[in-house]
């Protein structure tokens, strides 16, 4: 009985995003940003060089200008400690991208025309999936943190089911392959078999830094440096781990269902 009274007291907790705004989606620090006003040929400040040397995943490069690869970034914050004038948290969970190179910030962005054409091509492929979509999740060597965020998608706050999106245990019923982990040797074949068993049209989302680049532990004797060499990836969502809202952003980006005012020049 107490939980009934508590539920009545709390009211509706489910987010209104994407139909409405959500302060957590807009205000959560889901990525690291870098200054883009540096000129080519300008000497790299010592602080930036120190930040690049301190980055545990080599996500920062300085030639010809300071750049940060969000696909490698684990959000440790070392760069912001060493070079706060150059690196800072960037609020907003709209971090997913349709191309791997778009995750590199501090460089010249792709043209709007190229990005629009890519989004149109993907939307044309998945237009039949918009109403009822099923996701098959495969853990290809994750540290477990990505899975906690994925599980949160079905809780009352995010409630992915309200959008007509569900998880399935069968790849034959799946429209989206949501892959996490570095691509360990033991999961290479199961991941490929899952992909091959899915009917067309299908979309692959690389969820988290491990799936994109291998993160901290990729490239060793146990596995690969992400899943891109194993299956064709259409959507990349960075984060260590990616937040539930970032995962939702990636799924809706793949389906062409993002709101028009979404912060997604991807």
Residue locations for each model-derived region?
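Generic secondary-structure signature for well-ordered alpha-helical cores
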Residues: 127, 143, 196, 200, ...
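Local cysteine-cluster metal-coordination motifs and their immediate loop/turn environment
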Residues: 49-58, 71-82, 136-151, 209-216, ...
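Cofactor-cradling patches in redox/metallo enzymes
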Residues: 148-150, 155, 164-246
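Fold-independent oxyanion-binding glycine-rich loops
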Residues: 17, 30, 37, 70, ...
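Iron-sulfur cluster-binding cysteine motifs and their immediate structural context
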Residues: 34, 46-103
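Ferredoxin-type iron-sulfur electron-transfer modules and their immediate structural context
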Residues: 1-54, 58
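A charged, well-structured terminal subsegment
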Residues: 237-266
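Flanking helices and flexible, charged tails adjoining ferredoxin-like Fe-S electron-transfer domains
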Residues: 1-15, 44, 78-164
